């Protein structure tokens, strides 16, 4: 069974590994979509790598569709061909391990669909109907925000970075600081338009074609291409009280985070909860000011870190939403929440910003990094879901073990989520405990040798988790064997393979995930 499902994985070579591609069927270029295909070197080169800049794999062509129907035509052609070829949708290419690549196949430039008007439509609700937005899968979340705010509405859950596409995040899960209350973005989807691996165009929801609906949400692009998502909305606030609290003790930090996302506290507390970790010398040797912290703040935090035995400090990042009518009460509400917490005395930092400024906060950091040439660099990121019961072991073994002496460039996230806000009918994998931590090791390689060093550290992190039985799950996963994928999906694996047979029997879609090789239906059935 394992031999039949073996996968040709990309081999690391320096910063990039290169996958040799084959050819496309000649009659494709006589097909009706041929005029939308580009095969020139510049176009295929742009679709040959992603945000991670770790893996490179050249497609044979790039499709610039004017309509979703043209994508369906391409997929149907591949599925009916004697030699099916890979098809991978690409939005912003924000994957880190080549997940949006299509070696030897066709990359679909989903952003080309954005040229058409009317791809974001807001229904304000009323008369008992709840508000929602219909957004094309190619739309950036920043554009969805802009469109919904015109109606005084907004989605409930946001990723930290908004210059990524709707379909891209929904194919993974879409997590952020609001997810403890509302679940991931996929839990807030009402309906989808999907193109399956057979080339069928299907509208699905919890009640209509539910197998496809739950498969595609968090399905890593394995069962269909999302071309439209209907997403629930809520009234949008005008302002945000943005707070960061510093901790020198991890036990206190995690206890307070878990209190903040508990049902009792969250109903009257922060609307957003995340956390970050600062290691060792990053405060003293990093930037002297940030979009949030002033130079004076950073000097104080560096002093706190120097007094800590481990040199590690932790931040709870919280946000309270409010409007003009609740301005007078937000300070009282914040004071009430802070009285329940045990952050290091005097280390509370607040800012008052607009709702848009808060949601789009990473944009300012992006501008700074671009200006100094540190945005378009390799990003050997590793994102994990760590069981709440083992987060202190992870802290000791990784943050104060594997990373001892490290001076990472980038961000380390660490914050809890409630598992009961995830729908197990979806193929997306969450943490094992009732509460689990998101740990994002979002580090950048900025000098020669960094990629290899950071990859070794990532491998050491995974080895520690495996050897100690931590029970971590990868988010935005990447595995080097099908045994890894089998373990990742756990009890869902058999269902995942059944859904693959049903919706993409030739293994056409999103080959960059490297879950399945290109398979015939009979080979899949025999797994």
Curated annotation (Swiss-Prot):
EC class name: oxidoreductase
Subcellular location as annotated: Secreted, Extracellular space
Main subcellular location of this protein, as a coarse class: secreted
Positions contributing to FAD binding: 91, 93, 95, 99, 160, 165, 171, 175, 226, 475, 510, 513
Keywords attached to this entry: FAD, Flavoprotein, Glycoprotein, Oxidoreductase, Secreted, Signal
Chain ranges of the FAD-binding PCMH-type domain: 55-236
Any one Gene Ontology BP term: cytokinin metabolic process
PROSITE patterns: FAD_PCMH (PS51387), OX2_COVAL_FAD (PS00862)
Pfam families registered for this protein in UniProt: Cytokin-bind, FAD_binding_4
Single Gene Ontology MF annotation: oxidoreductase activity
KW Flavoprotein (keyword) present: yes
Task of the protein: Catalyzes the oxidation of cytokinins, a family of N(6)-substituted adenine derivatives that are plant hormones, where the substituent is an isopentenyl group.
Subunit structure: Monomer.
Name of this protein: Cytokinin dehydrogenase 6
Organism of derivation: Oryza sativa subsp. japonica
Lineage of the species this protein comes from: Eukaryota, Viridiplantae, Streptophyta, Embryophyta, Tracheophyta
